[in-house]
């Protein structure tokens, strides 16, 4: 890339893309993906609908069959460390705590889901009052972790434990990956200064900021 000014061809291509999306009547983003402000990344800090759709359909199934309050335990772990690294570094717990504390469905969220036509009305009303009431145990950030051992354990009613799965894995996998790589680099540097330039190749602004955070923890 040799500059930041968009060429005429790029602008025309962008306009064609917008026109194409409009012609297809593509659905809007979930409402809360467009609102709010985050203290760390400068945009939405409510990720309630950042989940795999099946988490919601399974929750609907739990609710309809009376299993929604069944207490269950989920363990987060990994199976191996690639390249003979021996151990990984845990990171991302702060973002998971923030997510759990802010986990709410707004009326706009529920209306968005109602429009999908696959959820019972009783379940949608339940979501309006959804609140995580379970317990979570986790190793501190920066802790060396090893294959097969629990990194984070969730004890909660089935519907709640199921719903947070996507975000917990997203955050732990990404930040622990970056922290582990950074730890290897720092150890290889043997006391020499190390700089973090992850933003240049990160997969988006969120990954850049949270990756830098994970590198610092390592």
Language-model features, listed with the residues they occupy:
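Serine residues within intrinsically disordered or low-complexity segments
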Residues: 7-10, 30, 38-39
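Buried, small/hydrophobic-residue-enriched core segments of structured protein domains
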Residues: 38-73, 80-82, 118, 124-133, ...
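N-terminal, Lys/Arg-enriched amphipathic/low-complexity engagement segments
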Residues: 72-128, 137
């Amino acid at each position: 890339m040799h500059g930041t000014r968009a060429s005429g061809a790029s602008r025309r291509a962008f306009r064609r893309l917008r026109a194409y999306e409009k012609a297809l009547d593509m659905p809007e983003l979930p409402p809360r993906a467009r609102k709010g402000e985050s203290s760390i990344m400068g945009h939405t800090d409510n990720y309630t609908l950042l989940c795999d759709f099946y988490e919601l359909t399974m929750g609907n199934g739990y609710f309809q069959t009376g299993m929604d309050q069944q207490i269950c335990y989920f363990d987060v772990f990994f199976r191996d460390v690639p390249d003979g690294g021996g151990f990984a570094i845990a990171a991302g717990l702060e973002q998971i705590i923030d997510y759990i504390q802010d986990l709410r469905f707004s009326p706009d969220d529920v209306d968005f889901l109602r429009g999908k036509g696959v959820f019972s009305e009783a379940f949608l009303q339940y979501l309006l009052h959804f609140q995580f009431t379970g317990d979570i145990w986790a190793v501190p950030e920066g802790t060396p972790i090893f294959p097969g051992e629990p990194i984070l354990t969730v004890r909660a009613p089935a519907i709640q434990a199921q719903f947070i799965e996507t975000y917990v894995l997203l955050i732990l996998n990404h930040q622990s990956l970056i922290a582990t790589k950074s730890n290897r680099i720092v150890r290889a540097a043997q006391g020499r200064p190390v700089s973090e330039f992850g933003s240049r190749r990160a997969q988006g602004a969120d990954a850049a900021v949270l990756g830098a955070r994970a590198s610092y923890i390592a």
